[in-house]
From Swiss-Prot:
SUPFAM superfamilies: P-loop containing nucleoside triphosphate hydrolases (SSF52540). Pfam families: KH_dom-like, MMR_HSR1. This is GTPase Der. GTPase that plays an essential role in the late steps of ribosome biogenesis.
C-alpha cells in the first residue's frame, strides 16, 4: 500500500483547492458553497519518485446538529484514522475559530505526523495576521495560498521527507471500477455494501454525492479502485453550476474506469436517462455490468427476472454483451455477485488471444461468408492480429480497408464474440491496408479505393 496523506479542516477553508493544486489537475469540485466536498476524495500523486495517496475530505465540524455535517465529520475521522500524515488546514482570512481549536485538540492525541497549515495567506498583512494561529500551541506552522500556489512546494518537500523512499510492498495493478447511474438509484449505498462499511455518505436525498469518490480496496487478492460518481442527469436538467461540474466529473470517471457498474432502479424500470448513461459507457469503450438495485422492493413471480432481462437486452442492444445482476444494496441480497462479475469482465477487458487462434477463427469466418465486392473489386483479407487491450483491439489487414462495410464488420464482430466470448467487454476491429513491395524492394502502402 502507498502512504496516505489526508487533508482535514473546517468547511470552506480551501481543502479541495489545495488537493487540486497538489494533484495538478481539477479533481475535486471547488465552489464557495460550504460543504461542497462531502466524502473523501482520493488521488495518487508522485513526487521525487515517491508515490502516495492524497485524500480530500468534507468539512470537519466538531459539534453540529446537522445530519449531513455529522456524516461529513465521520468521513473526516475515518480519513484521519487511515492516514499516515495529516494536513490540518485553516483559513487566515477567517482567523482562528473555536472549531479550529476543537480539531487541533483532537489532533494532539493522534500518534502520527500533523502539519498545521494556514491557507489564503495572499499578502504580507495576512501573513502577520496568521501569527494568531500559534495560539494553538504549535511549534511549526506553514502559511500557504493554495489558490495562488504560494508555499506549496516547501510544504510538499517536508511531507515527502517523512514518506518511505520506496513504495510499500503489495502494490499491484489496480482495476478502476466506476459506479454510474441516475441520481438516487442507490449508487452510494451499493458502494458501502460492497466495501462493508460506510465509506461514502449515503442519504436518501437525490444528488448527495457531488464529487466522484475513489476508494482503494482488495478483493480476492486483487486491487481495485471503486469510483462512486455523482448521478448523471441529462444536460437540460443540470441547472446549478455545481451540478454541471458533478456531471462532467462523472463522465470523466467513466473515462478513468476499466469497468462501469451501470446501476438501474428496479422500481422505476428503464428510463431515457438510463439509456443516455449506458451510451456514455459504450462510447468510452468500457467493460460493464448492469446492476439492477432495489430488487427487494418488487413483487415477483417466476417470470419477473426473465422479463426484466428481456427489457434490458432490448433497450440496451448496444451493450448486449454485459452481464446483469439483480441486487438489493439495502438488504445485501446477491451483492457478492457484483464483484464476481466485475472481476470477470475486467479480466476479459485485458484479455489477449493468441495469433494462431485468432487467425483460425478469422479464416473460418471469411471462408463461410465472403465480403461483398467494392467498386467491382474483390475484398481480400490477409491476416488478423491483436494490437491492444482495454478494450481488446484487433487489426485486420486487407487490400481495401474502405471496402469492408458496416454489415460485414458486424458479421466479423459476431463471429469473434461467438468464438472468444469477451463477456462484459466491447472490442474493436481496425481495418488496415497491407504494405506491398515495389520492384526495387521498397515498401509502399496500398492506395485506398
Amino acid at each position: 500500500m502507498k502512504s496516505i496523506v489526508a487533508i482535514v479542516g473546517r468547511p470552506n477553508v480551501g481543502k479541495s483547492t489545495l488537493f487540486n493544486r497538489i494533484v495538478g489537475e481539477r479533481r475535486a469540485i471547488v465552489d464557495d458553497m460550504p460543504g461542497v466536498t462531502r466524502d473523501r476524495n482520493y488521488a495518487v500523486v508522485e513526487r521525487y519518485d515517491k508515490p502516495f495517496i492524497l485524500v480530500d475530505t468534507g468539512g470537519f465540524e466538531p459539534v453540529t446538529e446537522d445530519r449531513m455535517l455529522q456524516q461529513m465529520r465521520e468521513q473526516s475521522l475515518l480519513a484521519m484514522e487511515e492516514a499516515d500524515v495529516i494536513l490540518f488546514l485553516m483559513d487566515a482570512k477567517q482567523g482562528l475559530t473555536p472549531a479550529d481549536n476543537e480539531v487541533a485538540s483532537m489532533l494532539r492525541r493522534v500518534d502520527k505526523p500533523v502539519f498545521y497549515v494556514v491557507n489564503k495567506v495572499d499578502g504580507e498583512k495576512v501573513e502577520n495576521e496568521a501569527a494568531e494561529f500559534y495560539a494553538l500551541g504549535i511549534d511549526n506552522m506553514h502559511t500557504i495560498s493554495a489558490a495562488h500556489n504560494r508555499g506549496i512546494r516547501d510544504l510538499l518537500d517536508e511531507i515527502m521527507a517523512l514518506l518511505p523512499d520506496e513504495p510499500l510492498p503489495g502494490e499491484d495493478e489496480v482495476t478502476n471500477i466506476a459506479v454510474v447511474g441516475r441520481p438516487n438509484v442507490g449508487k452510494s449505498s451499493l458502494v458501502n455494501r460492497l466495501l462493508g462499511f460506510e465509506r461514502v455518505v449515503a442519504n436518501p436525498v437525490a444528488g448527495t454525492t457531488r464529487d466522484s469518490v475513489d476508494t482503494f480496496f482488495t478483493c480476492n487478492k486483487k486491487r481495485y479502485c471503486l469510483i462512486d460518481t455523482a448521478g448523471i442527469r441529462r444536460k437540460g436538467k443540470t441547472s446549478q453550476k455545481l451540478e454541471k461540474y458533478s456531471v462532467v466529473d462523472a463522465l470523466k470517471s467513466i473515462e478513468r474506469a476499466d469497468v462501469a457498474l451501470i446501476v438501474l432502479n428496479a422500481e422505476d424500470g428503464i428510463t431515457e436517462q438510463d439509456k443516455h448513461i449506458a451510451g456514455y459507457v459504450y462510447e468510452a469503450g468500457r467493460a460493464c455490468v448492469f446492476v439492477v438495485n432495489k430488487w427487494d422492493t418488487l413483487e415477483k413471480d417466476n417470470k419477473t427476472i426473465g422479463k426484466f432481462v428481456e427489457q434490458i437486452q432490448y433497450e440496451f442492444k448496444f451493450l448486449a454483451f454485459a452481464p446483469i445482476v439483480f441486487v438489493s444494496a439495502r438488504t445485501g441480497q446477491r451483492i457478492h455477485k457484483v464483484m464476481e462479475e466485475a472481476a470477470e469482465v475486467a479480466e476479459q477487458y485485458s484479455r489477449r488471444v493468441t495469433t494462431s487462434e485468432l487467425n483460425r477463427v478469422f479464416k473460418e469466418a471469411v471462408e463461410a461468408h465472403h465480403a461483398p465486392l467494392h467498386h467491382a473489386r474483390r475484398v481480400k483479407f490477409y491476416f488478423a492480429t491483436q494490437v491492444g487491450v482495454k478494450p481488446p483491439t484487433f487489426a485486420i489487414f486487407t487490400n481495401q480497408p474502405d471496402g469492408v462495410l458496416t454489415p460485414y464488420q458486424r458479421y466479423l464482430g459476431n463471429r469473434f464474440r461467438d468464438a472468444f466470448g469477451f463477456k462484459g467487454t466491447p472490442f474493436r476491429l481496425l481495418f488496415r491496408g497491407r504494405e506491398r513491395k515495389t520492384a526495387d524492394g521498397r515498401e509502399r502502402k496500398l492506395s485506398k479505393q
